[in-house]
């Protein structure tokens, strides 16, 4: 073997075999292009992407690793999603889950005041967002914007968030 050489299997590989999958319709309602990476928790994608967020909870795009889907403003598209595997722990992204997917049983994206969009075939109105998860993580949030107000402050520095 030569250093850096790839030895490939002669057999074809098929990804995501046996995982739950679904197809949903999305639209970019914003005024800028949006790219969604292959392993991004789909329920937490850019707020200008309109779809029923509960359909994306616990799922990611079913595309090759390291690739992305790009939507120009006004673009509508059908995308294939696949269930997130492994330990099913979601950390980071838009920080709406920040833990095991199974711990959160409510749809936290409905009714958000900070630009989250939701569409439904039934046309039902979004429900009020429960304000528990931020407090449980010990963060001080501005009620109007749901922004961590400790970032950039002396208190935030002591807590390691600056």
UniProtKB/Swiss-Prot annotation:
Pathway: Nitrogen metabolism; urea degradation; CO(2) and NH(3) from urea (urease route): step 1/1. GO terms for biological process: urea catabolic process. InterPro entries: Urease_beta-like (IPR002019), Urease_betasu_sf (IPR036461), Urease_subunit (IPR050069). Heterotrimer of UreA (gamma), UreB (beta) and UreC (alpha) subunits. Three heterotrimers associate to form the active enzyme. Keywords: Cytoplasm, Hydrolase. Residues 134-143 have a biased composition (Basic and acidic residues). Its main location: cytoplasm. Induction: By urea and nitrogen starvation. The keyword Cytoplasm applies. Its EC number is 3.5.1.5. One of its GO terms (molecular function) is urease activity. Belongs to the urease beta subunit family. Residues 116-162 are annotated as: Disordered. The keyword Hydrolase applies. One of its GO terms (cellular component) is urease complex. This is Urease subunit beta. It is found in: Cytoplasm. It is an enzyme of class 3 (hydrolase). It catalyses: urea + 2 H2O + H(+) = hydrogencarbonate + 2 NH4(+). SUPFAM superfamilies: Urease, beta-subunit.
